[in-house]
Amino acid sequence: YVSEITPRRLRVYARAPQTGDLTLSRSIELTFAPDNIELEQDGSLYVAGHPKQLTFIRHVLDPHVPSPSEVVRLQLEPQRAERIYLDPGTQLSASSVAAPLPGHLLIGSVFADYFLDCQTPRVH
């Protein structure tokens, strides 16, 4: 999996086990600029990123400018995106990673010295 910030896209590659060669299998258009990708045990992907790229650049230059954060859970088969978190940057500016744990989702940022610990429903 490769996140592409400027085109707001996630590329999915198939890997040949014998050679290690990668072949593009699909591109998934997103509504935000994706940063890091976390693979869940069930094959779904948690992707964190930046809904407003120009605001993110302003945040890079001035940390007092809040930058929105977004996290989605992508299911590949069938393809489906579920927004997990969206914030204008008041709780956490410039989300860069979302790590699912049992009963929790940890969301980290590019520059913050803290992360969010969000409780999630337990699925049985």
Where in this protein do the model-derived segments appear?
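Beta-rich catalytic cores
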Residues: T6, A33, S67, S93-A94, ...
